[in-house]
Amino acid sequence: MSEKTFLVEIGTEELPPKALRSLAESFAANFTAELDNAGLAHGNVEWFAAPRRLALKVANLAESQPDREVEKRGPAIAQAFDAEGKPSKAAEGWARGCGITVDQAERLKTDKGEWLLYRAHVKGESTEALVPNMVATSLAKLPIPKLMRWGASDVHFVRPVHTVTLLLGDKVIPATILGIQSDRVIRGHRFMGEPEFTIDNADQYPQILLERGKVIADYEARKAKIKADAEEAARKIGGNADLSESLLEEVASLVEWPVVLTAKFEEKFLAVPAEALVYTMKGDQKYFPVYDNAGKLLPNFIFVANIESKDPTQIISGNEKVVRPRLADAEFFFNTDRKKRLEDHLPRLQTVLFQQQLGTLRDKTDRIQALAGWIAGQIGADVNHATRAGLLSKCDLMTNMVFEFTDTQGVMGMHYARHDGEAEDVAVALNEQYQPRFAGDDLPSNPVACALAIADKMDTLAGIFGIGQHPKGDKDPFALRRAALGVLRIIVEKNLALDLQTLTEEAVRLYGDKLTNANVVDDVIDFMLGRFRAWYQDEGYTVDTIQAVLARRPTRPADFDARMKAVSHFRTLEEASALAAANKRVSNILAKATEPLNDIVHASVLKEAAEIELARHLVVLRDKLQPYFADGRYQEALIELAALRAPVDEFFENVMVNAEEKDIRINRLTLLSKLRELFLQVADISLLQ
């Protein structure tokens, strides 16, 4: 069967830059699935994406499906014909569905009887006939939250479509896709190269587009070029470019022919906090800031043009003129804001609603202030500093700078607090209260910042759960999942002595009578334990290990973490599997027991050597392990408990638990309950698989 290279390119208006990669990857994944479902043999499926195009190139695509033999078994002969030998309705219906008459059917004889049988050789359909619908289906499944239509057409897509190129080898596959007739025409760069040209063979892509159209269609190649050229440009001015992955991706999605240029701004603007300048450069203008080797912002920036100019100084000058007013605004806001102390903004917080039922930002500030002070007392942080940080925590939201540059919240609070002469740990806490902002983000760096960050997040969790607005499905408008995980990470990774029970109760208490959910404390804790499950799964822990610990519902996060590590280590022991099975057996036996058990195991009732030996081990371990459990030394405790494998195996081998004599039976059940209680001090290992 012959194979050829296949190409599809959809030429569009400028596609959303933040969605470009996901659109291209989804297009490739969807089309690959279509090929596989159709049974079309193919090689590598390569995707291309530029601002005005999505394309796929498939190597070694078969020109048709393979031929196949089809067999369809019909009714049994007994049901296929009546007493007179005439075909039954069932037989005729089956034959009609196969496109034959009953007398054309074959007979299939087996040990179980005889059936009607249809056999046919089905010729594979051509790729040319299959591909148009496969492309259309793949495009229809793209993750596009909002479609648009253009002109008088009823066609909907993410952006208007101008060209559709469909080639199998050197042949155009005729089709109408997204309202456009397929062709071999490709559009080049808007301002360079050939605006439009034809491609003779799919193998020429993307090289022909590079040479004639001045478009780098390969997304990764374009991104790599921007990164390399920007690093070189920064090196030439003695600096290092801030090439964050997200901005690199966005810029690579904005240009077809990247040309990296270096520009500058007035040094006086460096008096403004670097974060505000960087926010303007990266967020508004998509520029790359440049730092010196000490990490200090330089009065330069790197940007990417989409055209090669004969006079690049004009482009540089134009970008400098664009950014200057934004930097001047930042300078003005910074100077204006510093005429007031942060504390002076407190009254205005009363005018901003946090949530309709939960009050204003000033109300939230009062709760955070109290809760941060309480947490500080629990973890040994400076209570006065934590209380002060709580009072000032939302004041920067009322400043001109944060109002204009919203992503500078927190960090501007830090700068203004330093200007006001606040304690350094208070100032730092104002910035770090929002950490961790995302998975893998840094945690607050000092105890006061930890107290404030936990207080802010717990206040939100308690409040939103307290009015019954917990996250549902993908909807989480108050980012409660992130808040919960943030609290857990801070407590665990900083090893803080906080209990979710008392922490949540305190957060709820501070709301007074505003909350309507009577089960808010349990709901918040259950939600946070659920985030533990997601976190530890991401960390590589097995589901049954997590379930074993969750079964004990430990509410101290640092303690939860210690149990997780202990159970994970226990699983590596040779005795683990047998003891997990034994615990499961014990759990089942005790679940079926209907008689009340004794408080203690009565030694005088023990008869068999195996039960006497097991009881002896339990007494020794009970006394030895109490300090281990009290100190959270769970890994050491489970290592000691692993020594029970032999006496437990011996017990089940030689002892009848459900003895006829009641006192013996109850004593043995009590013995097993004491065994189980020891393991449950750490986790329910009966859940381990």
From Swiss-Prot:
<keyword id="KW-0436">Ligase</keyword>
<comment type="subunit">
    <text>Tetramer of two alpha and two beta subunits.</text>
</comment>
<protein>
    <recommendedName>
        <fullName>Glycine--tRNA ligase beta subunit</fullName>
        <ecNumber>6.1.1.14</ecNumber>
    </recommendedName>
</protein>
<dbReference type="InterPro" id="IPR006194">
    <property type="entry name" value="Gly-tRNA-synth_heterodimer"/>
</dbReference>
<dbReference type="GO" id="GO:0006420">
    <property type="term" value="P:arginyl-tRNA aminoacylation"/>
</dbReference>
<dbReference type="GO" id="GO:0005524">
    <property type="term" value="F:ATP binding"/>
</dbReference>
<dbReference type="Pfam" id="PF05746">
    <property type="entry name" value="DALR_1"/>
</dbReference>
<dbReference type="GO" id="GO:0006426">
    <property type="term" value="P:glycyl-tRNA aminoacylation"/>
</dbReference>
<dbReference type="GO" id="GO:0005829">
    <property type="term" value="C:cytosol"/>
</dbReference>
<dbReference type="InterPro" id="IPR015944">
    <property type="entry name" value="Gly-tRNA-synth_bsu"/>
</dbReference>
<dbReference type="Pfam" id="PF02092">
    <property type="entry name" value="tRNA_synt_2f"/>
</dbReference>
<keyword id="KW-0030">Aminoacyl-tRNA synthetase</keyword>
<keyword id="KW-0067">ATP-binding</keyword>
<dbReference type="GO" id="GO:0004820">
    <property type="term" value="F:glycine-tRNA ligase activity"/>
</dbReference>
<keyword id="KW-0547">Nucleotide-binding</keyword>
<dbReference type="GO" id="GO:0004814">
    <property type="term" value="F:arginine-tRNA ligase activity"/>
</dbReference>
<keyword id="KW-0963">Cytoplasm</keyword>
<comment type="similarity">
    <text>Belongs to the class-II aminoacyl-tRNA synthetase family.</text>
</comment>
<dbReference type="InterPro" id="IPR008909">
    <property type="entry name" value="DALR_anticod-bd"/>
</dbReference>
<keyword id="KW-0648">Protein biosynthesis</keyword>
